[in-house]
Amino acid sequence: MEKSITNSPVLSILSYCAASILMTVTNKYVLSGTSFNLNLALLAVQSIVCLTAISIGKSFGLCKFRSFNADEAKKWFPIALLLVVMIYTSSKALQFLSIPVYTIFKNLTIILIAYGEVLWFGGSVTSMALASFVLMVLSSVIAAWSDISGAIAVSGSATTTVTALNIGYFWMMSNCFASAAFVLYMRKRIKLTNFGDFDTTFYNNLLSIPVLLIASLLFEDWSPANLAVNFPPESRNLIFFSMVVSGLMSIGISYCSAWCVRVTSSTTYSMVGALNKLPLALSGIVFFGTPATFSSVSAIFVGFVAGIVYAVAQIQKKKAEAALPK
């Protein structure tokens, strides 16, 4: 029974969807303050909390994963490094962009992963999948136009607003490339190492911590003045609590990502992310008061349709492959 649950594609997909929504909303809350600039420190805290929690779980027999092995760690380190780049660029993008825009642009990762599978795993792209890619790009264009025009209308300063959003789009595109590289490389390495889901979570977080801490100490401002700005007395305890909660949330997204990739495929994993964009984008409107304009809702809808078209394309592709003579 337990084995059938851990190998269930449907359950892994639903769990990944729930975890990604919780993680995005929690991170957006922590990063929503314009003064917060210790992104690497936040990510280090998340990894430390996640590693501590699964280690406690292992000691109580709640989960199992391999003991540390230097040779395995050396082989897994590039993936952990890609994970650091992925979550850092994600946190920077969330600082500058609203959740709906962020989630719509994440669709572009699917295109990169699909063509990555063509190059490295002998995959193929059907005409229907190509049509979904066009819709994904269209939804991103609509979202960007809506975001820029809406922000200018609110602030009244076109130059400052466009500059800030351009920074956000730069981090967003960087995140798309990092996410695609992470998913593709992790799928290949999981097959070679035969890692379980908690093995992946353990090594991802363990190897990320020193990289994040060193990078934070080198590149972020740890002066008393900046710490006071990042953690003002009136909200300090709430920020600390939110950072710990986001770390606990990272267990869910880290485990569910590895689980979903293992029991499905990297392309299905990215497709699920696309279908998950509708509730994820709506969470930004519900929890953070993102304006629900005609253009922003249209962008969300087009992005959602793109995900459905892509899902249908993948189903048809699987049926066609199954019909081929063995």
UniProtKB/Swiss-Prot annotation:
GO terms for cellular component: cytoplasmic vesicle membrane; endoplasmic reticulum membrane; Golgi apparatus; Golgi membrane
Membrane topology label: Multi-pass membrane protein
Topology feature Cytoplasmic, residues: 1-4, 57-74, 124-129, 185-208, 259-268, 313-326
Pfam families: UAA
UniProt subcellular location: Golgi apparatus membrane; Cytoplasmic vesicle membrane; Endoplasmic reticulum membrane
Alphabetical list of InterPro entries matching this protein: SCL35B1-4/HUT1, TPT_transporter
Name of the protein in question: GDP-mannose transporter
Gene name linked to the record: VRG4
